[in-house]
Amino acid sequence: MTSSDQSPSHDVFVYGSFQEPAVVNLILECAPVMVSAQLHGYHLYRLKGRLHPCISPSDNGLINGKILTGLTDSQLESLDMIEGTEYVRKTVEVVLTDTLEKKQVETIVWANKDDPNMYGEWDFEEWKRLHMEKFIEAATKFMEWKKNPNGRSREEFEKFVQDDSSPASA
């Protein structure tokens, strides 16, 4: 048995850009099993000047997303790295869309629940149309950086996930 066989696997609820298989496959360097699920008690917000959303607790919130099943510690670390320090990982209960079974999983929540940059509702289809190509380019650059930082900082990567089309980022 290898050391990776001994590590527990992780099931992670993802939303936003991580629902897109092309993004997940690039970041995790594989195609994990994805299961549709809903997270109650959270809202999916837009973030001013960003290509990606965040979630934060909300009494009446409901988020449709996916569970990435069986992730390794290394894959979970890749998700954490690309999200950065503005997010925190939490254990939440989701409901599987097909079976209505409840399941405890991990997800990534925006650390500052009072952030004034959170607004409205993030739209996956709009993101795919307007921003997916740029986000995949940014994720590719992130993976290159992760493999060989070459003196570059994480902040250089973060510039790629800024939404330069919005007036708020000007």
Curated annotation (Swiss-Prot):
The keyword Transferase applies. Ubiquitous. The lineage of its organism: Eukaryota, Viridiplantae, Streptophyta, Embryophyta, Tracheophyta. Induction: Up-regulated early after infection with P.syringae carrying avrRpt2. Expressed constitutively. The active site is at residue 83. Substrate binds at residues 15-20. This is Protein AIG2 A. Pfam families: GGACT.
